[in-house]
Amino acid sequence: AITEATEDILYSYSIISSDVDAGDSLVITASTILPGWLELVDNGDSTGTLKGTPENGDVGDHAVVLRVTDGSGDFDIQSFIITVENTNDAPVFTSEAITAAVEDAEYSYTMVAEDVDEGDELTYTAPSLPDWLTFDDSNTISGTPTNDNVGDHAVVLLVTDNFDGTAEQSL
């Protein structure tokens, strides 16, 4: 059996069964409840397919027990564990940027993001800011625009996880 799968990628295992008794029809079933992301298809010709696409919440080990039964009730069992490996998911911004500032009034926006990968550490940066804005350790950009700053300004904010997954927010 194929015992490794990767998050977000289709897992497929072709099942081929046989019986020494000629003419016996074989039925392939799961002897245990399959993980929600897995589907067992019995093709009706002594073959079947175990397939599915695991998601982030499926990372880890999953016990599978398959059973093939002939017309006489005789059966055989195949047991194995499928280990689903994590794929890095990029962080996403959960805060909505404030895109308008008022002349001579303080502007402040704190970036907030999340990452579905457990344990990922996030790093916030502001690689493109106008001169009147500053970025601090609390992931906040702030400043007070003057009359000289009236107009549109490109602002680019980034959040990166420790596996180089990145999200960008442009204001």
Outline where the language-model segments fall.
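Short beta-strand segments within Ig-like beta-sandwich modules, predominantly Fibronectin type-III
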Residues: 40-45, 134-137
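Extracellular and select intracellular beta-sandwich modules with Ser/Thr-enriched
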Residues: 62, 74-80, 153, 165-171
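Extracellular/luminal low-complexity segments enriched in Ser/Thr/Pro
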Residues: 49-59, 140-150
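Proline-centered linker/hinge motifs at extracellular inter-domain junctions
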Residues: 38, 88-92, 130-133
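Extracellular ectodomain surface segments
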Residues: 1-27, 76, 80, 89-123, ...
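Short, solvent-exposed loop/turn segments at the edges of extracellular beta-sandwich modules
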Residues: 68-74, 159-165
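Extracellular Ig-like/FN3 beta-sandwich strand-entry sites
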Residues: 10, 59-63, 106, 150-154
